[in-house]
Amino acid sequence: MKKTGKIGSILCLLALLGLTGIYALPKVYVLYQANTGKVDICLKEYMLEEGKEVPWKNGKDVLPGGFVSKIPRIRNDGVECYVRATVSFSSQKESEKPLSLENLEGISSDWVRDGDYFYYKHTVKPGEKVELFQGIRIPWEWKTPDEDNVWKACVRAEAVQAEYFSPDFTGEDPWGM
């Protein structure tokens, strides 16, 4: 019995020393630090009037098949970023041939369309400006008086910081959102 008690005491002491040894091992910490920058873009619209670029003005009368000069320009006022934009149309009256993204003209090959969005394929550097399109072609089908309509084209732009971000322009959703 005395022998068993000694062996048990020795085993307990060894176990206690072993556990203490494990806790005495050096610890390793991994720190991952990511810095975010300021993503800041500005969208302004312009038009050509008598060959000169001027700020966009509403209320232009356009004939069927006519072209409306409208130049949405996105300026990067923050860190390097990727930009995407969408255009939505609304009108006071319904039409058999409503305006759609197909009516946009002058879209550079630097933009890729996926669904309702146009994605700029390159990063936009601080201070850089990119233009989405140059204008809107009014459908030829708008010939009847009931299509004497007031319509709006609303452009919305979004940006995401380029650092730590890799869009996939071959996939279903380039930004994966």
Q: Each predicted region: which residue ranges?
A:
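Long, small/polar-residue-biased beta-strand-and-loop interaction regions
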Residues: K2-M177
